[in-house]
Amino acid sequence: MSCRLLLYVSLCLVETALMNTKITQSPRYLILGRANKSLECEQHLGHNAMYWYKQSAEKPPELMFLYNLKQLIRNETVPSRFIPECPDSSKLLLHISAVDPEDSAVYFCASSHGQGVSGNTLYFGEGSRLIVV
C-alpha cells in the first residue's frame, strides 16, 4: 500500500471522529469463540459505493470489499469465509463463517459518491471491534 493511500485513509478516519457521517455499524463490540457472525452497516448519504475495511492491531486498514452500484469488487487476498452482501444501495453486510483468532480486528464500513479513493471523499462508520477468543 502506498504511503499516499495510507495517509488518505488515516485522514479519513480522523475526519470521521469530527463529524456525523450518518453511517451506522453494528455491533460496536463483539467477543466470541469460533462461530458465524454478521456485521451490519447502513449509510444515509445517498452514496452509490460502499466498502469494508479490516484494521488489525498495529497495521493500516486493508480494503476487503467494495460495492459500486451494487457490483462487487473483491480483494482476492481476503479469505473466502468473509462474504459481503449488499441487499440495497444503503446497506452492506459482512458475513464471517468459522471465525478465527486472526480475524480479531476493527472492521470499518465506508461509503462514497463513486468508486475509488482518487477524487472521492470516503465517509467511515465508527467501526466494529471483533475479538475472537
Swiss-Prot record:
GO CC annotations on file:
plasma membrane; T cell receptor complex
Q: Where is this region: V segment?
A: 22-113
Q: What are the entry keywords?
A: Adaptive immunity, Disulfide bond, Glycoprotein, Immunity, Immunoglobulin domain, Receptor, Signal, T cell receptor
State the signal peptide span: 1-21
Q: List the disulfide bonds.
A: 41-109
Region annotated J segment, chain positions: 114-133
- SUPFAM superfamilies recorded for this chain? Immunoglobulin
* CDD domains linked to this entry: IgV_TCR_beta (cd05899)
Give me the glycosylation sites of this protein: 36, 75
Among the record's GO biological process terms, what is one? cell surface receptor signaling pathway
SMART domains from the UniProt entry? IG, IGv
List, alphabetically, the PANTHER family matched: T CELL RECEPTOR BETA VARIABLE 4-1, T-CELL RECEPTOR BETA CHAIN
The protein in question is named T-cell receptor beta chain V region 86T1
The scientific name of the source species is Mus musculus
Q: What is the lineage of its organism?
A: Eukaryota, Metazoa, Chordata, Craniata, Vertebrata
